[in-house]
Amino acid sequence: MLNCDMLIDSKELKSTISKLKNEDNYTILLDVTAVDYLKFPDVTPSRFAVIYILRDSTFTKEITIKSYVDDNTLEIDSLYDLYESADWAERETFDQYGIKFVGHPNLKRVLNHHQFIGHPLRKDYKITKGQICTETEDLMDEMVPKLKSKGYKKEEIDDLMLLNVGPSHPASHGTIRNFVAMEGETITACVTEIGYLHRGFEKACEHHTYSQIIPYTDRLNYCSAILNNIGYSKAVEEMLGIEITPRAKMIRVIIGELSRILDHLVCNAANMVDLGGLTNFWYLFSPRDMAYDLLSKLTGARLTNTYTRIGGLEFDLYDGFDKDLEEVLKAVEKGVEDALSLIAHNRIYHDRTQDVGVIKADFALRNGISGPNLRAAGVACDLRKDKPYYGYENFDFDVVIGSHGDVYDRMMCRFEEMRQSTKIIRQAMKNLPDGAINVYAPGVILPSKKDVYGNIEGLMNQFKLTFEGIQVPKGEYYSFSEAANGELGFFIVSDGSGRPYKVKCRPPCFYSLAAYSKIVEGTMLADAVVTMASMNFIAGEFDR
């Protein structure tokens, strides 16, 4: 969608969105962000606007809403009582822009540390201004109110054991700190702190050309980097009104689904280790290593591939790719079968995963959870089916869903999704068309070396694209794709230049992790560990 669908006065925002939710079934809040128009070429009613992105209950329609904020107060009503997913989303917007959400129960920083001064995504904040954190926050300002809301008195709180799980703990699967209060082995309250891997992705995007941002997207979910490349490139291409070639679409499907398999292999393999099943880990990591060899041969890198280009791809498939790919797919299928054979009738595995870390469907939707974590709760939401792109509507594959939303269902959904991805890849290879991998668009695609050295037009085009970047039409746009962990979205604002005015990434992990503390409260600490592993939090993605 180019430009926002609705412009709402801030005084009417809450009532209007409440109506959209209750009458028009826009029951999912996908994301919240803000735009600082301080240096925008057009005149705007005020400096800051807050952006809300909603999706309806059929998963087929989304709407982008803008509301300008009073420059004197910088206040706007919180939507937390309408959507639980507004919690961390509004905290992030406050953290990055200084917008105050009136009525939010815990409006404090979430990505930047507690000693940080200022708001880094404001246009008058210099990107070179670093700020060091010198002491750890004890998080008692969140823990004590949470315990009191559960009926604990001060003297009872003093008797609880307070424990930090992370940020540097093997079970945290990344730089996540969970501060828990415990009675025996049971978690009574949990406070999650993130930001340890925050690199300022969105601030960096504002200082680079559209093409230079692609390597940064690799570092979001580094377990399936190419899916990030695809999601970002797709967003910019849609802003440009470009449709990539049929061959490029099919190759993106092939490599994207292979990346999905890699992500699921890592998730389930790591979960097996937490459960004590090291043999299963090697069964799943062996085909992963084969796939990395294939990607290295294709893209020149094993992990951070930077494979897509705006308008196409960096390289075409090499000779013999089809044979190498089939070997990888067979290895994946064997690894999955071998791992499953060890746990299918394993009593210990069933006891550790069934009815553990349960996520109900309505809870998942209220909290903005998507992807396998949502499907495991019984909700058949997959953007490849609901909002198909790149010809996904022409592929024969099933949307895998669970029935209980527990650790067992989440793992089994990922195992079966790997099978479905191999099915998609084989269909795509069978129907792979010939032709170019990049569109013919001199203002988008770099010219060949022959043209650069052979004629002045090619030389000038190469110079302008390299130094000035692709000139994207002025506008505001939200694009999405079905990444390995759920809906990966990019909200981009263009001022018509070769650098984006704003880029906001909607990381699926961010919303799953925001809900994690509510899921594990009342469970055993050991169960909280396997719950975390089964939800597949990637620090590079939620911290950005």
From Swiss-Prot:
Main location: membrane
Origin: domain of life: Bacteria
Listed GO MF terms: NAD binding; NADH dehydrogenase (ubiquinone) activity; NADH:ubiquinone reductase (non-electrogenic) activity; quinone binding
Catalytic activity: a quinone + NADH + 5 H(+)(in) = a quinol + NAD(+) + 4 H(+)(out)
Region of interest: NADH dehydrogenase I subunit D: 161-544
Pfam families: Complex1_30kDa (PF00329), Complex1_49kDa (PF00346)
E.C. designation(s): 7.1.1.-
Alphabetized InterPro entries for the sequence: NADH_Q_OxRdtase_suD, NADH_quin_OxRdtase_su_C/D-like, NADH_UbQ_OxRdtase_30kDa_su, NDH-1_subunit_CD, NDH1_su_D/H, NiFe-Hase_large
Keywords, in A-Z order: Cell inner membrane, Cell membrane, Membrane, Multifunctional enzyme, NAD, Quinone, Translocase, Transport, Ubiquinone
Membrane topology according to the record: Peripheral membrane protein
Location in the cell: Cell inner membrane
Chain spans, region NADH dehydrogenase I subunit C: 1-138
Bilayer-spanning residue ranges: none
A cellular-component GO term for this protein: plasma membrane
Gene3D superfamilies associated with the record: Cytochrome-c3 Hydrogenase, chain B, NADH:ubiquinone oxidoreductase, 30kDa subunit
Family: In the N-terminal section; belongs to the complex I 30 kDa subunit family.
Subunit annotation: NDH-1 is composed of 13 different subunits. Subunits NuoB, CD, E, F, and G constitute the peripheral sector of the complex.
Purpose of the protein: NDH-1 shuttles electrons from NADH, via FMN and iron-sulfur (Fe-S) centers, to quinones in the respiratory chain. The immediate electron acceptor for the enzyme in this species is believed to be ubiquinone. Couples the redox reaction to proton translocation (for every two electrons transferred, four hydrogen ions are translocated across the cytoplasmic membrane), and thus conserves the redox energy in a proton gradient.
Listed name of the protein: NADH-quinone oxidoreductase subunit C/D
Gene from which this protein is expressed: nuoC
